[in-house]
C-alpha cells in the first residue's frame, strides 16, 4: 500500500524541471501566436487565394482558429488605400497662384493701349506703333491742295468740316497739313533766291498745282537764251547752198 501511495504521490507531484520546460514551450507558442497576429495586421493581403481564405505558415495552426475564417470579400480593404500619414496630400501653393496672377497683370500692362481717331500709340516697351500709311484719292488730294493754297493752318472747326466733306478723319487732315508745311518750308529754304522761290510764294509745289507749268517755263527760259531767226540761219548757213538769180531771162511761153 505504501508503494502504491508513493507512486500516486509521485505522479501527482510535479517535477520542477518538467514544469519549467512545459511553461517555456507554452510561452514560445503564445509568442509565435502573437507574432503571427502582428504580421497579419501589417500585411493583411499576404497569402490570399481566389477562394478568399487566409493561409498562414504558423507552426501551430490550431492555436489561432479565428484567422482561418472565410472573408466576405477578396481583400480586406481597397488596394489603393494607404495607411494614414503615409504621404501628405498635395495642396496648391498660394505663392504660385499669386505669381501667376502677377504675370497676367504684367502681360495686360504690356499690351498697347488702343487710341481712336488714328492717334500714335505706345506699347509696353515705350516704342511707337506706326499705323499703315493713308492713301488719298485724287479728289481728296485736289481739295486738300486747294485748301492749302488758301491757308496753311486750319482751325479746329475748319479741319472737322474739311474732314467730313472728304471722308477723312481729323487726324489724317492734320497730318497731311503738317507734312505739306514741312515740304513747303524745305523748298522755300533751298530755292528762295531764284525765280522758283518767287513763284512758290504764290502757288504750291504739288504736282496737282497749276504753278508747276509756270515754274517749268520760267526755268527753261532762263537756261535757253532767245534766238532770232536770221541768226539761226547764219549759224547753220554752210549746210544750205546760197540762192543765185539767173542773169539771162527765160522766154515766156505763149
Curated annotation (Swiss-Prot):
InterPro entries: Distal-less_Homeobox_TF, HD, HD_metazoa, Homeobox_CS, Homeodomain-like_sf, HTH_motif. The keyword Nucleus applies. GO terms for molecular function: DNA-binding transcription factor activity, RNA polymerase II-specific; RNA polymerase II cis-regulatory region sequence-specific DNA binding. GO terms for biological process: auditory receptor cell fate specification; camera-type eye development; cell differentiation; embryonic skeletal system development; embryonic viscerocranium morphogenesis; endocrine system development; inner ear receptor cell development; lens fiber cell differentiation. It is found in: Nucleus. Residues 129-188 bind DNA. Its main location: nucleus. Keywords: Developmental protein, DNA-binding, Homeobox, Nucleus. One of its GO terms (cellular component) is nucleus. Disruption phenotype: Morpholino knockdown of the protein causes reduced cranial outgrowth and defects of the cartilaginous elements of the jaw. CDD domains: homeodomain (cd00086). Belongs to the distal-less homeobox family. During larvae development, may be important for neurocranium morphogenesis. This is Homeobox protein Dlx4b. It comes from Danio rerio.
